[in-house]
Amino acid sequence: MNKLFRSLAFYMLILVISVAIAVQLGGTSQQTTQLVYSDLVRYIQQGEVRSITLSGAYAEGELVSGEKFTVQLPPSSSQAPLVEMLQQHPNIKLDFRQDNTSGIWAMLLQTLVPVVLVLLAFFFIMQQTQGSGNRVMQFGKSRARLVTDDRKRVTFDDVAGIDEVKEELAEIVDFLKHPKRYLELGARIPKGVLLYGPPGTGKTLLAKAVAGEAGVPFFSISGSDFVEMFVGVGASRVRDLFEQAKKNSPCIVFIDEIDAVGRQRGAGYGGGHDEREQTLNQLLVEMDGFSANEGIIIIAATNRPDVLDPALLRPGRFDRQIVIDRPDLKGRLAIFQVHAKGKPLEPDVDLEVLAKRTPGFTGADIANLMNEAALLAARRRKKKISMQDVEDAIDRVLAGGPEKKSRVISEKEKRVTAYHEAGHAVVGHMLPHMDPLHKITIIPRGRAMGYTLFLPVEDRYNISKSEILDRMTMALGGRAAEEITFGEITSGAQDDIERTTQWARRMVTEWGMSEKLGPLTYGMKQDEVFLARDMTRLRNYSEEVAGLIDEEVRKFVHMAYQRAIDILTEHRDALEKVSEVLLEKETLEGKELQDLLEQLLPPRPKPEPLKPRMVGGGTSQVAPAF
């Protein structure tokens, strides 16, 4: 910092002095006229000279017009005629000065200052470009960051909820620690490991944990850091990355979002992207070029493995592909325990209950949830995080944004919202395959005027036809309540209708749940151009079948809507009572909500158990919903 300050001060001083000299010389040159000797003689004879000072080989003076002048005189031996001429004109003030070289210096400075300024400017520019030149030379270098700080080392203890994945990667760690054990047996450790799964499931954290457990250098780079607008830069960076890795082997090279550079070649508009494909080609060569005993392991992460080039996924490059999915109940509990460390919790905080309340949450979601709970507790001036803080944080994450209690809502809209949400609650309570009702509120949050929250009690990986129809019926319960109560419908059911239509179409075209169309898939999945797949594909069904698909979708939606109408018509009193209580309290949840529904409605019907039935003379276990 001091060196930079001294350099700036030096250049500023030079600049100020140069400007001052230039201004002075510029001012003098603007007021003084350079005359030749013959002009001076003529002006003297014409009486146009007011004063003159002789100083050796130079003379300076002033004309009658006020204009100042300088003139170079002949040698001293030839100046006698000039002196005699001046003495003959007594009106001219004559003066003599000792010979000095001020005129010479003035002319010299006037000539040299611009040159000096140009040289200084050139020197300054060269110094600046010297650093820039280094940056230019670094342009083709890898941007990988070497992580070696032991204080921030991540281990497998920091990763929870994905024990099976950690077991897969433990082999990589053991190889990095004891490579001879594998090499003596002729074993070849996987050169590359591809981690793929939904965002937030811990792919990057796992890669850091592998490096932390093995205690080796960890290079981290994003796939987008390779490709630039200049041709050849990406390939150069790939080469430099592997050169650095070889110097620090054994080590781990982690490429995050590898789909940015590893996308399938020759796809999209124009046949692909030349620079990206060159970079990918170089990456393929480097991954297949180094031998197993060099101790370099590539770990890559992506949430779009389907768009990667097949050559990148073949054995010898990414030998091992590991799916990292959303954690189950046991995994979520372990993740909650990790993120609860270091946070003061009230005794009422039950992590197991929270794990049950958050199905589908990833590790990143849970980390964000606990952070939101801590922020809410701090905002409420608490010393510890309570269960209510975490519950409010869950609602904030699920519903989007804080409660908007300050929003001014008319009584009419508030009443419509109350009946809409009560319709969801009553219909959902009377459906056998619906999840338990957890909360209902008419306080706006995010873009919603209110919401009804059903929470599953277990993780599900398949869903039956009966469950889908129950969800569709519950979703349309709000619209049905509006029509039954007010005889008028609103736009508040827009999201409900979109979800219901989407479910119905997938039942017909993807899941084969239509009796009329049978167990067939209709229509090819269309991938966008930027996903490096074909831009579009023709549908694989006729116009007649398209009409049948629309008819079946309409049938499923109308069936669900009529079912919701029937339930609310039968339990109209319960709809009215729940709406009144909701208008009074605005939010109902937990035991209070369950007690109210059990008081107003009969017990929820239990789903029919799956029973074997005879199919074609044999016995097979078939779900009635399918």
UniProtKB/Swiss-Prot annotation:
The active site is at residue 421. Residues 602-626 are annotated as: Disordered. GO terms for cellular component: plasma membrane. It is found in: Cell membrane. The chain crosses the membrane at residues 8-28, 104-124. It is a multi-pass membrane protein. CDD domains: RecA-like_FtsH (cd19501). Its cofactor is Zn(2+). It is an enzyme of class 3 (hydrolase). Keywords: ATP-binding, Cell membrane, Hydrolase, Membrane, Metal-binding, Metalloprotease, Nucleotide-binding, Protease, Transmembrane, Transmembrane helix, Zinc. Its EC number is 3.4.24.-. Residues 1-7, 125-626 are cytoplasmic. Acts as a processive, ATP-dependent zinc metallopeptidase for both cytoplasmic and membrane proteins. Plays a role in the quality control of integral membrane proteins. This is ATP-dependent zinc metalloprotease FtsH 3. It comes from Symbiobacterium thermophilum (strain DSM 24528 / JCM 14929 / IAM 14863 / T).
